[in-house]
């Protein structure tokens, strides 16, 4: 596949993922149009999801170790790396996350193990476990 076709395929998948995340979480997600090095592919408008760093991949051949390293680098020390991928011809999206972010009591070391979830299970995890409670009172200093 040529470079332009691959970029279009990637951009199309990122838009699809943003729409699916919006539907699944009830929050607006959007594709980041001009990615700089270290930026995630898809971001939420809601600050409660600010730590989530999403990397999207749609490819004929899966390169999970390399993609996971990219997701980890983009997330940095404070972020939560999430790799959403689909192999061409496969049914549905898969979501890879750090096992520590799923259950820190069982997996106390960040970055040592990953867990791959189906879309529905991943969205339940994202809705229930990930949002940071952002509390503020406008007008109060």
Spans of features found by a protein language model:
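Catalytic phosphate/metal-binding cores of nucleic-acid and nucleotide-processing enzymes, i.e., regions
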Residues: 1-141
């Amino acid at each position: 596949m040529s470079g332009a076709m691959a970029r279009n395929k990637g951009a199309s998948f990122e838009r699809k993922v943003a729409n699916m995340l919006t539907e699944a979480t009830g929050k607006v997600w959007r594709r980041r149009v001009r990615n700089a090095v270290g930026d995630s592919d898809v971001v939420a408008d809601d600050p409660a999801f600010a730590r989530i760093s999403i990397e999207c991949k749609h490819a004929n051949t899966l390169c999970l170790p390399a993609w996971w390293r990219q997701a980890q680098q983009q997330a940095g020390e404070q972020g939560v790396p999430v790799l959403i991928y689909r192999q061409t011809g496969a049914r549905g999206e898969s979501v890879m996350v750090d096992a520590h972010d799923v259950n820190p009591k069982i997996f106390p070391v960040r970055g040592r193990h990953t867990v791959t979830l189906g879309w529905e299970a991943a969205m339940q995890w994202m809705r229930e476990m990930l949002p940071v409670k952002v509390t503020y009172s406008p007008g109060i200093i």
